[in-house]
Amino acid sequence: MKLKVETSQGTYRYKFVPIFEGIKRIDKTIAKENLGILKKVCDEAHLQFILFYGTLLGAVREHDFITHDEDIDLVMYKTDMPRFLDLLFTLREHGFELARYERRGFLSIIRKGEYIDVYFYEPYPHDENLWFSCQDICKKEFVLDLMPYPFQDDTYLIPRNYLKFCEYYFGDNWQTPIQTLKFDKSKSAIFKQYVIQYIKAILPVSIVEKRQEKTSKPKLAKWIKKIYTQK
């Protein structure tokens, strides 16, 4: 099934790729290669990204990708999303393909079976101290106050107060490795997830976005409560 994204450089067409939690373990060698290529392309375009979520946790705790993770997590600014979409054609020349795309501010690119999730953050309209992307939200300092950090033989941007971010997102015991992802899904479970992702891909965007907005509200509320109750 062919999908498409409109960019200022023309229509980018891509194939449906089922991606869901627990689909595979990360291949650290390819992940390092992919991250380095993406950084080079973004640097040349004067676009910056931030290591986030599990990738940030691995960088500051293991100084490596987490063995039981499955992908790379990055954050960019929503205002840079159109420029990043323009780079899809350049990234294709390096072996990357778009795997999934949500206009609200999320996409995944894949190369050699390893994918990178990119979350596009923007100011939260109901609280000037917060920024959000889709159903994730955090204090604005975590996406605005940054510092360079050595990782995988290069230097990447991370939140300056990364200790506080890890406490916020992963809990007080964030320094203790805990495997939360399971990679032993049954064939029926994999097929079910494939069908869900396929239906989502073929539904009209307006229907998908209404559903996403509805399911995101309680999750955002949960995160906001945690932000303002955290010590």
Placement of each model-derived feature along the sequence:
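Short, surface-exposed, low-complexity cationic segments
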Residues: 163-175
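Conserved catalytic core of two-metal-ion nucleotidyltransferases
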Residues: 20-43, 88-139, 143-157, 165, ...
